[in-house]
Structures are given as structure tokens and as C-alpha cells.
């Protein structure tokens, strides 16, 4: 497979680029060709107030009680129509009823239809007052949507809301194909709720029954309904055979849940995956609780652990209440560091180094906002479990613009840092940052002059263990005060470029910024939350080198850059390119001996960055970026991608990602950046392709190769067949799943997945390419 997937990808790329548009019409349109439509004018109003029209070759009767019609009988009332060889009409006075009860018995080639359903059989009956209808020993077909079957007795009730089948069957396959069907002793199709309820249900593939349930629900529309969803299965080297049987629970209009028993053969148990979604006055949210009672593989690999229970809890919430209160939750926690290596989960990945648990409550009115939050981290490292949490953190902003020619702002923060280890330093930090801006602008440019005053106080505790092992000592009480001054100027020049194309416009946008921050020795402050910020072109113009407040680097620098853009006649950006640099008049320092490049005493032009985007045509696009930092030795990061995209099912993308080992060490936490797989940095080339290969077949492939390690990083191949009544998807993925320190080699997980989807029950007729692309561990991202 290691050699075959790149070869297959090359074939897919070539065919995607040069294939013709000779595919058949959209699958949904094809499927609807086999579905009857209602072709008579739709009649509105109360059916009982509408006249009854009867046409027949012969008629006789005993007026007003009975009448018999024979020969091509055709009875119409409103949208309902009944045809038969013979029809007997009966009319009887009912005690207490203002209208007589009119019923119809139909014999021979009975055909009933309205704008909802068609019923056919040898014998029928109808109540013209209630529109109740029976047809014996016949078949039915939904109108305007897929769905048909047979029954010993078919009944229309509730003014055509319900179709009830005695000893009946149901399938969404088109006439002439019974690939799958469900048969039951009673089937009730509720058009209003868009659901089919089946008692004593047997699910059949062709003529063979393969599943029985005393009760089953099938959705027959896009409306939310409780019931079992389609099961799926896969095989992986991590868990062997896996089987999923999801159940959807429509709890209320503002909340629902999906409960999925997930059987894993190698683990010897069932994981219960529970996803709950809700909408409240305080916002919308999603919770996930996955629980595996015991794991025999984990027991063998971790014999000293007290429990082999595995679990995940995820909660995401975002909302606004009363227009002033903000509530946000971003919480992920797992039972152990190996969880995402052992189990696939959309709320985390084996490439993650940690999980975040954050809660925040905010209050915002004009010119003022405040947020109280707590933030914790769960580190996925067996060797280093040290991490800091903010318990709690208060952030306050006050704005007052148009104070004469000035804009003003005061930012304040108070936070208490706690470590997961008892011997590590802890601190309370209070920060105050008043800012004054003088913004000036006109039609062709702007200049913003800004002055800040940065005042921070630290009260550090629990320093004995750290100070006894380091030459640089931490102080219990530290005050750091520094000013900051910045001038940022931009200009925009524009011209028409008729030589390129009529209506095209080019801009030239030079930008220059001077930043001054004096040096303050911060070696007596522990680093609680600062790390080097990742840079692109826009990042060159940040006034901070580090995130957080523990490390504020000195600056005496000029940043210059230029951006050029090209817009077409519809004002769509077709091309842009940006190039910029930072020139240091003095070395940027914090006094932290752990930051290695501060010892080099480098000045001059040290950091370069560039970004570009080119929408070559409606189908071709290119993106790229590069950062050069001499402090980190040569190129720090780079990325590029080129994509051909005809539509969502036909695309090819080639991409490359690079990060130097020095850059990873500087930007990621130590426990993560020193992992074996990152010691040589990242140099990864990849290809993604998808296309329909026939009328109803589609294929997706992805391949990523690490040029540093000369090893495959990830590969995926998926094939889907889609028809009008079912879709089958088979996928293979080989992904990097960790590092074996004992054997010094990468650990891979191989997975083979199998999924079946019943079609015609909803409006989804997609070829499945986007779902397969998103399921990869390195998901596809659109370049266009």
C-alpha cells in the first residue's frame, strides 16, 4: 500500500485534470425521474365542501341511497381520485350528523391517488366524508418522493396524513429494484412527522432477512425524529473489529441527543458515546460523554493503574443573554494521556499535545467589558505532567474614543496561576495597561500613533525547589514597569490595469511601523503563560513577540512591508502578494536565559515574512507563505498549496508544510516540542484528490510523506458507490499514532471502514467526497 497509494493518486490527479464533463445528470434528478409527480392542479380548501365528479360507461341506482357505476369508472373530489372497473356508491343518513355518510366500494383494477400517495389493488373502499381509504392486496407509491411497497391491506387515515399497512413492506428503491426493504406486521407512515413506524420489523437485503426488531422507526424526510440511525462498521489494528449503532433522540424542539453503542472487539467491551445538543436563552451548546467501562488492552499495557475505565467529556457553549452577558465554555478532558491514540474522536486527535478546560462569563456594554474565566490544561505526556492553570482570571477593558483627536483604552488583568505539581512556582499577577491613540486618515492612507504604559506586579510563592536548582533566582515580589511607543502608517494606491483584463484593478499598499519598548530584565519572573507567537506577514506588525504577559521583549525596530492586490470587475480578489521585514536597531531581549537566541546579540534585518494568494481561474488557486528568522537559523516556517477544484466532488490539491526544529522548540511547550517525532522539525509533502470515476462511483485519496524521516505520515483511500436507494462507502487509512521510545520507531494505525447509507429517506444524494475528505486525520482545507 505504501507505493500503491501515490501511484493511484497520480492517476486520479491526471484524470481529474483532463476528464471531460461527460457525467450523467445529478443523481437526485435521476432518482426523481422514477418517482411519480402530481400533475393535476392543486385544489385548496375543505374537501367536504368540494363537489364529487363521477364518470363511467354505465350507471344505475336507487336514489338517493345507492348507485352502481361500471366501465372505466373515474371519481374525483378535490385532489383525490378513485378509478376502478366497478364502483358502488352508498349514502346513508347518520343520526346526529348534518351530512349523510357517503361510502364507496371499488372492484377490479382499483387505482387511488392524491397529491401524497398512489394505491393500487383489486379491491378498495373509501369514505368520501372523512377521506379514509382502504385497498386490499395491492401496492403503493409515494408522490413526489421516494418510497413504495406492498401490503395485504393499505389504509389512508387522518385526511391522508397516515398510510397504514397490514403485513406490508417499505423501500425507498425505485420500481424494479428491491435491494433493501423493511417488512412488518403493521407499518404506519406519518407524513406530518415524516416517520415510518414498523412493528415486528424484518430488514431484508434482496429476499434475505438479516435483521429483526419488534419495533423500528425510519425517517422519511428531513424532519428531526427519534429512532435508530444506520449502523456502520470498521476494522483497525488498534481495536480490531468495531461496530456502531447510533440512536437519535429528539428530546424537545431545543434539544436532542445521539446515543451510540460502539463495540470494540480488542477492547472487549462497548463504549457508550453520548452527544447532547441544546439551545437555551444563554446560548447554544454541545456536550459529549464517552464511557468505556473496562479496557483489557489498557489493563495489559498499564498493570499499575487502579482502573481501566476510559472516558471523554467535551463541552462547548457560546451565547449571549440580555444583550450584555456572554457565556463561553471550551472544555475537553479524558481519562488518560493515551486516549486519543487509542480512539478516534472528532473532539481531539493523536496529534494534540494537551486538552483545554476553559470557562468564562463576560459582561459587555458600550465602552466597557469584563470577563471572569478559569483555564486549565491536561497535558498528554507521561514524562512531563507540569502545566499551569489560571484560577481565576479577570480581564477588564474600558474604551473612550473621540476624546478630542484621541482614542483611549484601559486594559486590566488579574490572574492567579496554579501548577499541577506541588513543587513548582505559583503566582498572582496584576497588570494595568492604559493606551492612548492618535488616529489620522484620509482616502489614500492612515497613520496611527500609539503610546502605552505597561505596569505588572507579581507575587510569587513556592519558590524553594526551583531556586535551589537554578542559578537565576526568582523573587517573591516583582514589579515591572515599561512604556511602549508605536507609529504605524499605511497607504493604498490604486490603478486600473486594462492591459490584463477589462475592469481589473491593482492596489499597492505599503506599510511601515516603528516600535519602541525598553528592556526590562525578567529573569526573576517565572514563565507562566508566554510562548513565541507564530508569525506570518500580518504577524510582523504585532507589538508583542510573545503571547501572554510574562515575557515582554524589548524593541527598537522598524517593520516595513508592502502588499499588492488585483481585483476583477466584480471586485473579487484574484491575486495578492505581501512581503515584509523587521529591522532591529538593538537586540530584542527579555533577560530569560532559557531563550537561546538572546545570547547571540543580533541586530539588523532578522525576520522576513511573505504571503501570497493567486486565484488563477474559477478552478485553479494557489496559496503560500514563508518566514525567515536568522535568530532561529534560516527558514522558520513555510507552507504552500495549489488546488484544482471543478466542484465539491472533483478536486486535486498538492501541499507542502515546513517548520524548523528550532521554531518548534521555541513555539511549543517543552514537553511537546521535544517529542521524538518533532526533533528534526516538520517537512511534509501531501496530495489530496477526489473525483467521480463513473456515473455513481466516487473515489478520494490523500497521501502525506515526511521528507525528514523519509516515512509516510498519513494516507487515506475511500471509495463510495451511490444509488437512488443506498450508498456504500469503503475506506482505508494508515496514520501516524505515536512513537515507540523503546524500539525507536513510529507507530502506525491501519483502519478499514465500511458504511452503508439508505438513500431516498432524506434529501441527501451526495457522492460522499466531502465527508471522506473531512474524516482524515489531516483534513482537507479549501485553497480557493
Curated annotation (Swiss-Prot):
Major subcellular site: membrane
Cellular component aspect of the GO annotation: cell outer membrane; transporter complex
Keyword entries, A-Z: Cell outer membrane, Disulfide bond, Membrane, Signal
Coiled coil: none
UniProt-listed GO biological process terms: Gram-negative-bacterium-type cell outer membrane assembly; lipopolysaccharide transport
InterPro entries, per database record: LipoPS_assembly_LptD, LptD, LptD_C, OstA-like_N
Origin superkingdom: Bacteria
Cell compartment(s), UniProt: Cell outer membrane
N-terminal signal peptide: 1-24
Gene3D superfamilies, A to Z: Lipopolysaccharide (LPS) transport protein A like domain
Cysteines engaged in disulfide bonds, as pairs: 31-724, 173-725
PTM annotation: Contains two intramolecular disulfide bonds.
Keyword Disulfide bond: yes
Stated family: Belongs to the LptD family.
Function comment: Together with LptE, is involved in the assembly of lipopolysaccharide (LPS) at the surface of the outer membrane.
NCBIfam families: PRK03761.1
Matches recorded under HAMAP family: LPS_assembly_LptD
Assembly mode: Component of the lipopolysaccharide transport and assembly complex. Interacts with LptE and LptA.
Protein name per Swiss-Prot or TrEMBL: LPS-assembly protein LptD
Organism: Shigella flexneri serotype 5b (strain 8401)
Amino acid at each position: 500500500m505504501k507505493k500503491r497509494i501515490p501511484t493511484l493518486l497520480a492517476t486520479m490527479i491526471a484524470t481529474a485534470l483532463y476528464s471531460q464533463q461527460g457525467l450523467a445528470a445529478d443523481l437526485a434528478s435521476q432518482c426523481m425521474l422514477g418517482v411519480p409527480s402530481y400533475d393535476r392542479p392543486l385544489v385548496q380548501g375543505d374537501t367536504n365542501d368540494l363537489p364529487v365528479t363521477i364518470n363511467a360507461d354505465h350507471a344505475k341506482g336507487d336514489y338517493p341511497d345507492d348507485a352502481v357505476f361500471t366501465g372505466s369508472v373515474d371519481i374525483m373530489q378535490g385532489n383525490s381520485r378513485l378509478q376502478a372497473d366497478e364502483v358502488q356508491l352508498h349514502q346513508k343518513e347518520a343520526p346526529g350528523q348534518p351530512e349523510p355518510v357517503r361510502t364507496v366500494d371499488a372492484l377490479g383494477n382499483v387505482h387511488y391517488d392524491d397529491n401524497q400517495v398512489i394505491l393500487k389493488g383489486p379491491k378498495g373502499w373509501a369514505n368520501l366524508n372523512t377521506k379514509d381509504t382502504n385497498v386490499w392486496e395491492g401496492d403503493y407509491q409515494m408522490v413526489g418522493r421516494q418510497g413504495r411497497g406492498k401490503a395485504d391491506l393499505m389504509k389512508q387515515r387522518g385526511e391522508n396524513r397516515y398510510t397504514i399497512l397490514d403485513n406490508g413492506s417499505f423501500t425507498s428503491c425505485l420500481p424494479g429494484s428491491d435491494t433493501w426493504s423493511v417488512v412488518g406486521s403493521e407499518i404506519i407512515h406519518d407524513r406530518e412527522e415524516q416517520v415510518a413506524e414498523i412493528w415486528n420489523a424484518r430488514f431484508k437485503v434482496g429476499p434475505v432477512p438479516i435483521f429483526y426488531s419488534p419495533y423500528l422507526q425510519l425517517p422519511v424526510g428531513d424532519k428531526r425524529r427519534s429512532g435508530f440511525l444506520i449502523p456502520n462498521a470498521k476494522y483497525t489494528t488498534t481495536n480490531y473489529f468495531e461496530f456502531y449503532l447510533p440512536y437519535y433522540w429528539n428530546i424537545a424542539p431545543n434539544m436532542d441527543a445521539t446515543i451510540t453503542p460502539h463495540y470494540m472487539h480488542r477492547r472487549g467491551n462497548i463504549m457508550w458515546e453520548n452527544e447532547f445538543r441544546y439551545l437555551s436563552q444563554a446560548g447554544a451548546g454541545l456536550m459529549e460523554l464517552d464511557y468505556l467501562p473496562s479496557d483489557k488492552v489498557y489493563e495489559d499495557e498499564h498493570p499499575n493503574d487502579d482502573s481501566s475505565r476510559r472516558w471523554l467529556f467535551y463541552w462547548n457553549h457560546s451565547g449571549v443573554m440580555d444583550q450584555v452577558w456572554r457565556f463561553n465554555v471550551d472544555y475537553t478532558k479524558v481519562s488518560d494521556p493515551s486516549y486519543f491514540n487509542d480512539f478516534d474522536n472528532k473532539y481531539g486527535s493523536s496529534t494534540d499535545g494537551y486538552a483545554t478546560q476553559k470557562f468564562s462569563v463576560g459582561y459587555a456594554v458600550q465602552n466597557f467589558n469584563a470577563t471572569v474565566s478559569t483555564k486549565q490544561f491536561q497535558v498528554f505526556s507521561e514524562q512531563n505532567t507540569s502545566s499551569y492553570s489560571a484560577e481565576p482570571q479577570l480581564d477588564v477593558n474600558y474604551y473612550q474614543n473621540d476624546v478630542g483627536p484621541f482614542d483611549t483604552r484601559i486594559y486590566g488583568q488579574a490572574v492567579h496561576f496554579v501548577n499541577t505539581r506541588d513543587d513548582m512556582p505559583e503566582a498572582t499577577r496584576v497588570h494595568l495597561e492604559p493606551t492612548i491613540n492618535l488616529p489620522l486618515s484620509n482616502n489614500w492612507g492612515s497613520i496611527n500613533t500609539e503610546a502605552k504604559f505597561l505596569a505588572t506586579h507579581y507575587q510569587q510563592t513556592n519558590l524553594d525547589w526551583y531556586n535551589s536548582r537554578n542559578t537565576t533566582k526568582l523573587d517573591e515580589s516583582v514589579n515591572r514597569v515599561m512604556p511602549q511607543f508605536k507609529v504605524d502608517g499605511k497607504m493604498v494606491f490604486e490603478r486600473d490595469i486594462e492591459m490584463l483584463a477589462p475592469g481589473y484593478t491593482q492596489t499597492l499598499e505599503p506599510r511601515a511601523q516603528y516600535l519602541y519598548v525598553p528592556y526590562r530584565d525578567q529573569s526573576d519572573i517565572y514563565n507562566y503563560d508566554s510562548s513565541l507567537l507564530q508569525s506570518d506577514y500580518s504577524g510582523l506588525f504585532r507589538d508583542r513577540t510573545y503571547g501572554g504577559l510574562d515575557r515582554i521583549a524589548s524593541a527598537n525596530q522598524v517593520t516595513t512591508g508592502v502588499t499588492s492586490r488585483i481585483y476583477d470587475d466584480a471586485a473579487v480578489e484574484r491575486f495578492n502578494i505581501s512581503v515584509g521585514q523587521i529591522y532591529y536597531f538593538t537586540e530584542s531581549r527579555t533577560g530569560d536565559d532559557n531563550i537561546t537566541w538572546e545570547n547571540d546579540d543580533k541586530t539588523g534585518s532578522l525576520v522576513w515574512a511573505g504571503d501570497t494568494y493567486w486565484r488563477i481561474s474559477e478552478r485553479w488557486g494557489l496559496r503560500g507563505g514563508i518566514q525567515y528568522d536568522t535568530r532561529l537559523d534560516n527558514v522558520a516556517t513555510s507552507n504552500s498549496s495549489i488546488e484544482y477544484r471543478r466542484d465539491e466532488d472533483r478536486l486535486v490539491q498538492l501541499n507542502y508544510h515546513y517548520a524548523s526544529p528550532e521554531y518548534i522548540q521555541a513555539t511549543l511547550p517543552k514537553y511537546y516540542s521535544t517529542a521524538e517525532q518533532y526533533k528534526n522539525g516538520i517537512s511534509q509533502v501531501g496530495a489530496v484528490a477526489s473525483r467521480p470515476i463513473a456515473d455513481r462511483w466516487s473515489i478520494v485519496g490523500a497521501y502525506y510523506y515526511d521528507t525528514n524521516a523519509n516515512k509516510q505520515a498519513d494516507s487515506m483511500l475511500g471509495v463510495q458507490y451511490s444509488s437512488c436507494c443506498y450508498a456504500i462507502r469503503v475506506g482505508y487509512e494508515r496514520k501516524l499514532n505515536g512513537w515507540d521510545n523503546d524500539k525507536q520507531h513510529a507507530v502506525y494505525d491501519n483502519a478499514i471502514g465500511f458504511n452503508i447509507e439508505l438513500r431516498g429517506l432524506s434529501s441527501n444524494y451526495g457522492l460522499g467526497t466531502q465527508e471522506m475528505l473531512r474524516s482524515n486525520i489531516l483534513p482537507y482545507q479549501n485553497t480557493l
